[in-house]
Amino acid sequence: CEKEGIEDPRKQQLRYIKQIEQLRAEVQGSFLEGYYDEIIRRLELGEIVKSPDMEDVDFFRCLNAVVNLKKSLWMRVFSAAVLNDSKRFKKDYEKKVVKVLVRSPLYEEGMTDDEILSVHGILSYAQVMEWKGPLLYKLKGGQEYIEDKAREKEYEIDTSQNQYGTVINSQTLERAFPVSIKGVQRIVTIENKANYEEMKYREDTLYLFCHGFYSPKERIFLKRLMEVAEGEIQYFHWGDMDMGGIRIFRFNKKNIFPKLKPYKMDREAFQEALERGAGIPLEEKKKEKLEKLNAGELEELK
């Protein structure tokens, strides 16, 4: 019989199973289904699950909210929306949520917590998109009236006139839609800011600054470039020749440009960089990780 105030263990397990099944139903088709399936199996085997804390409803609320996010949000805005407290997510749940997000197909080994959250749409730093090249995009904003009916205004902005580059912030990025990259034969993402700045404007090339792992907003914008491209386009990535550069190349190829090829990231370029005095000795642990890393087309850099 149940003692007063103490829940019967069997009933508690059944309650937990039902709770997790409901959470799983909210994230159908996502990697979290597998995470919740594991918890259910543990509960069905009679395990007393302590990690995660089954009574911490807010943790599960945060987890599902991240996966179901429709647009990028600042971390404090997300925290206020989900927990009614702008600082609580960072204080109580950031580390716990990140620990689960490493299961996501968007995860690349070595990502920082900020990068993991950013690729899922939780932002902790200013987000801008930078490029050089003949990109025409449509921007929605404001209202106009046609026959007394209000509709959202649309503007077409031709950035081919910005010979030294174009920069748009996160609000603009959210409302911008690429319309044309007429004449472009190559799209090149460049990880190093100095290298990006040195590139001269070319009518046949679109240079994109790659600050790291692209966020959801940026990935949507970049994928649309492929939809409006005319003819056969070549895709290249010029990144740092280290573990981070390899991971960013893999991420961009897997999640944005399937035909992406490395640019100036071969053995010859690596040797030239060493001769110029670039590079630092690798710690033994990092060296071991690099040797185990599946570098794909960049295998020779290992």
What does each of the following model-derived ranges do?
Residues 265:
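Active-site donor-binding loop signature of nucleotide-sugar glycosyltransferases
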Residues 234-236:
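Pol beta-like nucleotidyltransferase catalytic core
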Residues 253-256:
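C-terminal, helix-dominated tail/subdomain
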Residues 1-209, 214-228, 232, 244, ...:
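Nucleic-acid enzyme cleavage-core boundary/entry regions
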Residues 238-244:
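Extended C-terminal subregions enriched in glycine
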